[in-house]
Regions:
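Bacterial Sec-dependent N-terminal signal peptides
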Residues: 1-26
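Short glycine/proline- and aromatic-enriched beta-strand/turn motifs that initiate or cap beta-hairpins
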Residues: 20-77, 88
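Short loop/turn motifs that connect adjacent beta-strands in outer-membrane beta-barrel proteins
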Residues: 21-37, 78-86, 130-133, 162-167, ...
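Transmembrane beta-barrel strands of outer-membrane/channel proteins
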Residues: 41-47, 89-93, 123, 138-142, ...
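Outer-membrane beta-barrel translocator/channel fold
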Residues: 52-56, 60-65, 92-121, 167-218, ...
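Transmembrane beta-barrel architecture of outer-membrane proteins
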Residues: 66-70, 116-122, 150-154, 200-204, ...
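Residues on the lipid-exposed face of transmembrane beta-strands in outer-membrane beta-barrel proteins
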Residues: 71-75, 121-127, 155-159, 207-211, ...
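Outer membrane beta-barrel transmembrane domains
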Residues: 109-111, 223-226, 232-263, 282-297, ...
Length: 394
């Protein structure tokens, strides 16, 4: 936790002098110069434990910790024709340690994936015609760690209705991934050196429509179609058959997913908002899931608010899942990854937001400090905790 705090403080110091020098713009003037609209500094700490590790065939520790730090900078500029140009630049780095990944090599003191760093930058450009209510966007991203490299791209289109109370959005994303095939030590070919590689591709299309029903109620409908192909197993996951033999996880090379959701926000006066969300999910691996989420931000004073939240999730098992020692040679595909088992889970927590009129630490443009904590509990013996800190410059 000390590392999380120091990282956030160091990033804050980078912008301190600038925040003190820039005057507030209280006019309606739209600057044609590129300027900083918003900066978010986020640090989080995540910890989990369980006893159904897929690395050891569905048994064994799932202990894991992750420290993540991201910086998100949004820049805006208005062109001569009044077009708004937005550039969103984000960079993040995680460091994790995993007791289960340390068991890839059962005889070694430490396996290749027992701890790692992940670096994930992204860049998004939006071109908004405010007069027509139309926005187009394009973005690129990447994610790099020891055994995984991912490159992503997306395009989007949004159009508001004539009365500006509704908005339609279409978005397409693709991710091109490459995995190192780090096999369990006992399944590697004798004398083999290095690791092989395999590809995984994801294509996702999203359609959404949001509508202001009245002064108090807003709703959004969203649907996705997601197609994956390539190597969809994880190479270091073991599967133990009923005869005691050990195998490498084997899954189909295609997967098709359809999530459908609805989101609503209801404003109870000036101080309370009720935010609700429901999602139904299905795929061609016979996994079906339901998610229900509720968050109620309550403004206690002009500068302080609380946001209790709760999420319930339930899913059926994928048709290729069986616990430790239950698969047989008759199974074409097999996994003992409990993320694909039948379970239900709950996630409960609280957010605290502080927006003092004079800014955080007396820095006017650093106007928001938000702390969120959540506890996650799953019916198949997995539990986790996460705490995050977000400091916003605007």
């Amino acid at each position: 936790m000390k590392r999380v705090f120091l990282t956030g403080a160091a990033l804050l110091a980078l912008f301190q002098s600038r925040a003190q020098d820039i005057p507030a713009d209280s006019t309606g003037y739209k600057s044609r110069k590129l300027k900083v609209e918003e900066v978010n500094l986020v640090s989080s700490y995540y910890s989990q434990n369980g006893d159904h590790s897929a690395v050891t065939g569905g048994i064994g520790t799932q202990k894991l910790t992750d420290i993540a730090n991201t910086i998100d900078v949004r820049l805006i500029k208005y062109g001569q024709t009044g077009i708004k140009h937005t550039f969103d630049i984000e960079a993040g780095i995680d460091h994790y340690t995993s007791a289960s990944s340390d068991m890839i090599d059962l005889s070694a003191n430490s396996s290749a994936s027992s701890s790692d760093n992940r670096f994930y930058p992204s860049l998004t450009y939006l071109r908004e015609n405010e007069q027509k209510g139309r926005t187009i966007g394009i973005g690129v991203s990447s994610s790099t760690e020891f055994d995984y490299q991912s490159f992503g791209g997306n395009i989007s289109f949004s159009q508001k209705t004539k009365d500006r109370n509704g908005e339609f959005t279409a978005r397409f994303q693709t991710f091109i991934d490459q995995l190192k095939l780090i096999e369990p030590i006992e399944l590697r070919d004798p004398g083999s050196e290095g690791y092989g590689s395999a590809n995984r591709n994801t294509f996702a299309g999203t359609l959404s429509y949001s509508q202001v029903i009245n002064q108090r109620l807003q709703v959004m409908l969203v649907g996705d179609i997601i197609s994956q192909n390539g190597y969809l197993s994880l190479p270091f996951h073991r599967v133990y058959f009923a005869d005691g033999s050990v195998h490498q996880e084997k899954m189909p090379d295609t997967r098709f997913k359809i999530p459908l959701g609805i989101r609503a926000s209801y404003f109870m006066g000036d101080n309370i908002i009720i935010r609700a969300y429901y999602r139904y999910y299905t795929d061609d691996w016979n996994l079906k899931a339901h998610t229900a989420d509720l968050e109620i931000p309550v403004k206690l004073t002009q500068a302080f608010s609380l946001s209790p939240f709760y999420r319930y999730y339930s899913q059926s098992a994928a048709k290729y899942f069986k616990p430790y020692g239950e698969h047989t040679a008759a199974d074409e595909y097999y996994t003992s990854n409990y993320d694909l088992s039948k379970f239900n889970s709950s996630f409960v927590g609280m957010g605290l937001k502080f927006t003092p009129p004079d800014g955080i630490f007396g820095l006017k443009h650093w106007n928001t400090l938000e702390i969120r904590y959540g506890h996650y509990n799953r019916s198949n013996d997995l539990a986790s905790d996460i705490i995050s800190i977000n400091i916003k410059y605007r």
